Amino acid sequence: MKINFIHKIQHIGIPVHCMEVSIPFYERLGFENVMESPFEFDGGFGTCVMMKNHEVIVELYQMPEKQLAEIKERKVGHIDHFAIDVEDVDYAFEALKKAGFDIIEKEPTFLAFWKNGTRFFNVKGPNGEIIEFN
């Protein structure tokens, strides 16, 4: 059976240490808080925030205090990176560099992927997440 019902990434979930740091970080990348809700987990309460930029949705969730220590000890969270398409990699690189983002590479990197190759760079988020721009 061929699975043909997957259309696109719906959202990317990132466990965060502190909403007060994470929300402004994603706002600086052009994301908007489109939903915020508390949730109950294991006798405590956490917070979930959906951040949206065009068709890209990032779910930031802060677990209750009891689970927060384990999340803070993670090096890269549950996902090691997620990628965002940009129109012009060089423009995005310079704009984010000028804005003071923590860019991992010194310049966009070329990989011989796909038919014509791809260029990308990565930004480190406040919770150890890596955001690839290509």
How should these model regions be labeled?
Residues Q67-I84, E94-F101:
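Electropositive, surface-exposed helix/loop patches at the edges of structured domains
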Residues M1-I3, F93-N134:
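Vicinal oxygen chelate
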Residues E55-V58, I79-H81, T118:
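Structural motif
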Residues I6, I14-I57, K98, W114:
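Core segments of cupin and vicinal oxygen chelate
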Residues M1-V21, I79-I84:
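N-terminal beta-strand motif that seeds the catalytic metal site of vicinal oxygen chelate
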Residues Q10, G46-T47, D80, R119:
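Residue-level marker for the onset of beta-strands and adjacent loop->beta junctions
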Residues V34-E73, V123-N134:
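Conserved short beta-strand elements that form part of the metal-binding/catalytic scaffold
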Residues V21, D90-E94:
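Short, conserved charged micro-motifs
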